[in-house]
Amino acid sequence: MFQFLFFDLDDTLLDFHRAEAIAVSKAFRDMGVTPTPERIRQYSAVNKRHWQMLEQGLLTREQVLVQRFACLFQELDIPADPVACQAAYEEYLCVGHYFIEGAEALLAALAPKYRLYLASNGTARVQESRLKSAGIGPYFEQVFISQNLGANKPSPAFFQRCFARIPDFDPKKALMIGDSLTSDIRGANGAGIAACWFLSLIHISEPTRLAL
């Protein structure tokens, strides 16, 4: 029987796609860039590629945060400042939280019966702010964010550092719940714990390739 439940945050509990689109639109306007739907989609694709490179160990977090905007503005041939855009985007993202349908009720139902933990690859300042804004922080015994741990999902180091901080932890009673095959599911399998893949409507339209 499972006792330790690890939850991913973005697109598992909170709708990151929606928060991202709103934050990017506002940041673009600050830069004098018209936030068309096509540009928002293009940013999302560029951002996803950069986070995948982080998961593969090809980029650092600091490189991802600025280079995604630098790459996008180069593709669009727009002379905007990627550093300033990243700063504006982060400010707007900090205050944006939108629940995946049923997520809050699920946490409320599970918290009295299981030990809940958050396991996120997001930036610490942003994720901590969104957790506070959403009011779901108290459901978790501990919040594990890759920037604070010094390791990213799916690396075994991320999970081992989480496990080491949990009293009486038993990997046989642990379950990772997340939407990403490459970071959540692959990471859990590599760390020797069970995994539950959350396939939301956000991903239905995207090609799915098993990452195991």
Show where each model-derived region lies.
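Short acidic capping loops at alpha-helix termini that bridge into adjacent secondary structure
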Residues: D81, P138-Q142, D170-A174
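Single conserved hydrophobic/aromatic residue that forms the stacking wall/gate
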Residues: I202-L212
